[in-house]
């Protein structure tokens, strides 16, 4: 079975994030969406498991968007995505007081699906 290029890109980017020492996890979103799909849930569950093995670590949840909307709308969407991921982390057992949420809006270094993301960074 041949994977569509977008799905292949998501898989490769997710794998890179997960195998980079296990401290940074990346959740991707569809355009103009803050809903979590199954793959996003899986990444979040992995991040939560990692965070729960080190309860003294802080967990940063940083949302980004592509440039599909206005800068103000994109900041709001990135904040909404970060909150959605933070809520899922809490549902998976991560204490809410360990989470730092931030929405940064549009990214400059990437476009498309790579920009529509939330990064979960677990600091020891």
Please identify what each model-predicted range represents.
Residues 1-2, 17:
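N-terminal hydrophobic targeting signals that begin at the initiator methionine
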Residues 10-32:
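Bacterial Sec signal peptide processing site at the extreme N-terminus
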């Amino acid at each position: 079975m041949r994977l569509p290029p977008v799905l292949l890109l998501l898989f490769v980017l997710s794998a890179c994030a997960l195998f980079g020492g296990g401290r940074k996890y990346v959740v991707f979103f569809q355009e103009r969406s803050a809903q979590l799909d199954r793959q996003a849930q899986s990444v979040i569950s992995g991040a939560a498991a990692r965070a729960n093995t080190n309860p003294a670590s802080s967990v940063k949840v940083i949302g980004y968007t592509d440039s599909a909307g206005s800068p103000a709308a994109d900041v709001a969407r990135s904040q909404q995505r970060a909150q959605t991921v933070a809520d899922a982390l809490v549902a998976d057992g991560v204490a809410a007081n360990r989470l730092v949420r931030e929405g940064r809006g549009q990214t400059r270094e990437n476009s498309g699906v790579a920009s529509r993301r939330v990064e979960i960074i677990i600091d020891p």
